Swiss-Prot record:
It comes from Synechococcus sp. (strain ATCC 27144 / PCC 6301 / SAUG 1402/1). Its EC number is 2.8.4.4. [4Fe-4S] cluster 1 binds at residues 14, 50, 79. Residues 140-369 form the Radical SAM core domain. The gene is rimO. PANTHER family: RIBOSOMAL PROTEIN S12 METHYLTHIOTRANSFERASE RIMO (PTHR43837), RIBOSOMAL PROTEIN US12 METHYLTHIOTRANSFERASE RIMO (PTHR43837:SF1). Residues 5-116 form the MTTase N-terminal domain. This is Ribosomal protein uS12 methylthiotransferase RimO. Binds 2 [4Fe-4S] clusters. One cluster is coordinated with 3 cysteines and an exchangeable S-adenosyl-L-methionine.
Amino acid sequence: MTAKPTIAFSHLGCEKNRIDTEHMIGLLAEAGYGIDANEALADVVVVNTCSFIQAAREESVRTLVELAESGKKIVIAGCLAQHFQDQLLAELPEAIALVGTGDYHRIVDVLQRTESGERVNAISQEPSFIADENLPRYRTTTSAVAYLRVAEGCDYRCAFCIIPHLRGKRRSRSIESIVAEAKQLAAEGVQELVLISQITTNYGLDRYGKPMLAELLRQLGQVDVPWIRIHYAYPTGLTPEVIAAIRETHNVLPYLDLPLQHSHPEILKAMNRPWQGNVNDRIIEKLKEALPDAVLRTTFIAGFPGETEEHFRHLQQFIQRHEFDHVGVFAFSPEEGTAAIDLPNPVPDDVKEARRDALMATQQPIAERRNRAQIGRLVDVLIEQEHPSTGLKIGRSARFAPEVDGVVYVQGDAALGQLVTVRITDADIYDLHGEVASAADLFQVSRQPSLA
């Protein structure tokens, strides 16, 4: 009997891609394939690619070319495979298979077919699959953190975004399925669940006929996981019911990742997000009133076609006015297959980059000021790693999401994968510094009257 090839994975792109990678690893391991972290030692490398913007495609292509030049057999999975399909097989002889964004559950069959010499194109033209709690999964995050996908795909048609083409229409999992997987992850010792989809506030609309995020949060409140974090909350979906569920569910963090993209109504209309233009300010104000301790992250696009200096200043003032905790800014990237590529009045590349840098410079003192407000506080920190040279523990407080926000550098003994109370002693633009709380610190907290 011929031995099965050893497989390595190269993961690129977002956390949704990461979950796809984790399912492929789990499926292959269950089928008896050896999984090697070292690409050089593996017989086949599965590259789970990103194709969201030009820079991501370039990174994916560089990775593929480097592996091809080293003589590796390659399986191209993910968004680049979904985007370009047969073109990749034609241009990369080393590519033995393509696996689409809705086809990762077929990875074992794909590998078996390649072993007989077939070049496999396993791409559904309209991705429709979404994994549930029964599909094998091997997590690649730190032991205490897991991403939990509640839905896949998107029915919106924002002018700049190619995701509906790459990921298909929205399809939500059932509440029962999501809660079952959350319980599995809790049993593995996970301390933080990060809920993800393309638009998490629209969870359930396709399955139940109305958004069901509020009900999902309340159900997840019964799961023994200390932290539940919401990513990709479309601002107009933050209904009073959702806000109440966040406020009233003990393990749901008051942390909201809001992809606002811009502030000016004219640009939002051009982005095909017109309903957002006149409510951005009201939404932020309502959130801060209902959730005064909320941590707000957002992303913006600089240099969208037609963006004038007036539009740019409007966005800059919006950032100054609302003082977000975390802001990411991307220079607009024109994408084939989106409406924005044909819009008039494109902004020159150097202007886009300058505006991006200016917006980040606007945010930095705000971020540092908000971080410095943490100095002296006792906060829970999830310890995730140890610095190899200093011995400092590295973790995150509730105000920091994994991978996209800052970290907390902690002095003192603290077990990996556990929540530890830390006194914050210093702060900079992106990170906090602290020390494990003393017994006196904890006694002082226990003596404070309840604010409930």
